[in-house]
């Protein structure tokens, strides 16, 4: 069984269009076990009962940004080992450095191509 058949991914973005585009790309890669939500708090709640291998999260979201969510993931025993990819339109060095300090596994700058997303995922979880 291929990794793409086993991997579980959560997509977190306040923009439904972005969630849809990422989910479509994942589907094109053969990844079908995908959950999505529009904000960090609901993602954290969902992860308590439905763990995933990887979270792909937008940085700029109301209420709780992607780095705040990453901090919560890394300080919770149940989620500290979950892979994390940050997607941001602001790939400034301070954001990326803070993400690395918190345990971010990889990041993508918007806009990105589907193959860039695939390479980013494979760098975190292995070849799809």
Predicted regions and their residues:
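Receiver (REC) domain active-site loop signature in two-component systems and cognate sites
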Residues: 61
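His-Asp phosphorelay/catalytic-motif detector in bacterial-type signaling
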Residues: 51-53, 78-83
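Acidic, metal-coordinating helix/loop segments flanking the phosphotransfer/catalytic sites
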Residues: 23, 36-54
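C-terminal output helix
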Residues: 94, 112-121
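Conserved acidic segment of CheY-like receiver
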Residues: 6-17, 22-26, 55
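Active-site residues of response regulator receiver
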Residues: 58, 88
């Amino acid at each position: 069984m291929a990794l793409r058949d086993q991997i579980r991914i959560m997509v977190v973005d306040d923009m439904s269009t972005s969630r849809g585009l990422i989910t479509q790309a994942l589907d094109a890669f053969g990844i079908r076990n995908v959950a999505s939500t529009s904000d960090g708090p609901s993602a954290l709640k969902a992860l308590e009962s439905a763990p995933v291998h990887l979270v792909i999260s937008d940085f700029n979201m109301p209420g709780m940004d992607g780095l705040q969510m990453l901090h919560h993931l890394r300080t919770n025993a149940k989620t500290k080992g979950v892979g994390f990819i940050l997607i941001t339109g602001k790939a400034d060095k301070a954001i990326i450095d803070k993400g690395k300090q918190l345990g971010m596994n990889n990041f993508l700058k918007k806009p990105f191509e589907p193959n860039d997303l695939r390479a980013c995922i494979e760098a975190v979880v292995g070849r799809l």
